[in-house]
């Protein structure tokens, strides 16, 4: 093979790997986080775990990616090790899908039907449709479909380029001699493992082997040990991802290794013993692309079947390899679900961000309600809890914000990118709500320390204000947690009512001050209190408006709120009226 032949082969390999990556990314984006959500909610049913593991891997075209994802789930405590075993088994079956697709390049025959099945017949059409969707469509889903079609077309073109480049090697004695060496089971396994470990994809390494079949020099006796080695080499990705993870995550990576390593040993021992007694006629024949796909599938299905009754043994083997220590019973870090491993699969990472953001929102809400209760019933321990929770919310903002910024730099769909931006805005508002909770607790502490108290009328007004603030807080956070846009639309009318409440309570305080029914010192406390209440309502409004804007694909906050209030929006006015009546202060003439 001359230099041009080598360049053609390497170029074909580059196109092949690029096409596989593009197709996998397109499939992953199109499926969104649905498949990952299914994995997160995995039951202990091993058959269901195997099927779902195979499905996810067939979709994202990478058993390594699935296994790394599983290692992340186990590391963050989302998935148990026993559940992970079934998914890992299924991933090994799902990864054979690529080899079956690539086997289409080996189709021979002159009939119309056989011609239509050849990639050279239909991939140009797929490429044209794909590039049309990518360049002309505004829909992100159609763009993803276009990416899948283009990726598949490039994958097949790269495969054919590699096959054509290596075809002349059929007459090369040195090449034939090298392949004959790999018919030695040990050398073949080592070669397959090294190749797969280097390119980090068993699907790609099997594809390269299928391309080599074009030379006619690859026999099944050579291909079998190489395929076995490829299944072992793919474990390197998961083992590397487990570095720095907890013990269960390391065990999950070892399960993947043991599954393939022991499965390979058992399969090869049985195969060569049977072949020695009853020689397989096909063993010394030239392999073709379909034959490679069959061998790849048979091994992975065989390994799954023999391990299925011994899943507990596989789990025990992992526990023996990575033993627990006495100090390993420390509580899990709640930020473990923000695992860097998930960043390789943005839809999974985004789901974890949402989960942490919900916890942060609940913590901020609980902190605010606790501080509001201190106004009527003060105790030092609750003040300490408010301060502790505020620090906890600060940590949430720091950890989650940093993770979201890392996630935002990844190749996200437009929808996921908008969700990341929404979360970044909302966690800032949650943090500010907890800050106002501390301010409110300081108002309560000042009143307690100085022996101050509100007048009866002021207490009645604050009680009504408390009700309105509790409702807007619950409405905004519940809407955020459930993605409920209709509920979010109830926040702004209530925020307008709260603004009016603050103004009216302040005016009433001034009247009482003039009549000598209230002191200036209490006036300062009251002003601080209702100002913090009103600011909390503003942050609730920010959260709701951000959700609505992303849903409506409109990002001018000032214009949105101005238009909402200025255009006599019927829904806004109706809700405003309902909330105004619900949180109406006692009649001024009677109270003053």
Report the location of each language-model feature.
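Hydrophobic core segments of alpha-helical transmembrane domains in multi-pass membrane transport
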Residues: 8-22, 53-57, 125-137, 150-162, ...
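Hydrophobic alpha-helical transmembrane segments of multi-pass integral membrane proteins
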Residues: 42-69, 185-208
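Helix-loop-helix hairpins and the membrane-proximal interhelical loops
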Residues: 1-46, 145-194, 212-215
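Interfacial loop-to-helix junctions that mark the boundaries of transmembrane helices
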Residues: 1-7, 109-121, 175-181, 221, ...
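Cytosolic, long alpha-helical scaffolding segments
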Residues: 79, 105, 218, 244-250, ...
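Membrane-interfacial helix-loop connectors
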Residues: 69-91, 99-121, 159, 196-233, ...
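Short helix-coil transition sites and intra-membrane helix breaks within transmembrane domains
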Residues: 24-28, 57-65, 166-167, 195-204, ...
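Membrane-embedded alpha-helical segments of transport systems
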Residues: 59-66, 85-102, 119-124, 155, ...
